Design a protein with these regions (language model features):
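Generic structural signal for small/hydrophobic residues in well-ordered secondary structure
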Residues: 5-6, 40, 82, 108, ...
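Short, well-structured N-terminal submotif of metal-dependent ribonuclease cores
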Residues: 1-36, 44-63
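Alpha-helix capping/helix-boundary segments
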Residues: 8, 36, 78, 104, ...
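Residues that scaffold the ATP/ADP-binding catalytic core of kinase and kinase-like folds
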Residues: 11-12, 40-43, 82, 126, ...
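Acidic, PIN/NYN-like endoribonuclease modules and their adjacent C-terminal/linker elements
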Residues: 1, 105, 111-137
């Protein structure tokens, strides 16, 4: 099992990565952070007016996409780990501006899973998180 970053799920949704998806599928189910679900839902909310057919279609498409994965909540251990990551990076003078990625990394760390991402530079500076580059996956 691996934790997939939002960048990977967006790429899967866009298509054209069948070989990578086949490799993931061979490895079993994978995990998403609730943060990824929030980011994907935000796209639906910003691109479509609620109550429209386009909104319902986008929502249905998102539901089908998310059904392929297990979803991990932002739990107390994840929040605590995220705070520790933020504190450590700030003390090192290497803050990470993207709080979403901090929570995704914290989920990976608490679940002891590698994170698969197209944004390797966001995650490599975080200790105790194994990073797999989606571009070379």
């Amino acid at each position: 099992m691996k934790l997939l970053d939002t960048s990977v799920v967006v790429d899967i949704d866009r298509g054209g990565v069948d070989d990578k998806v086949a490799t993931l599928d061979e490895q079993g189910r994978h995990l998403l952070s609730m943060v990824t679900v929030t980011e994907l839902q935000l796209v639906v909310e910003l691109q479509h007016d609620p109550g429209t057919d386009a909104y319902r279609e986008a929502q249905d498409k998102l539901t089908r996409l998310l059904s392929r994965f297990d979803i991990h909540p932002v739990s107390r251990p994840v929040a605590t780990t995220a705070a520790r990551i933020i504190g450590s990076l700030k003390q090192q003078g290497r803050p990470l501006d993207d709080l979403h990625d901090v929570y995704i990394a914290a989920t990976a760390r608490t679940q002891q899973l590698p994170v698969v991402t197209a944004n390797v530079d966001h995650f490599e500076r975080i200790d105790d998180v194994d990073v797999i580059d989606w571009e070379t996956f």
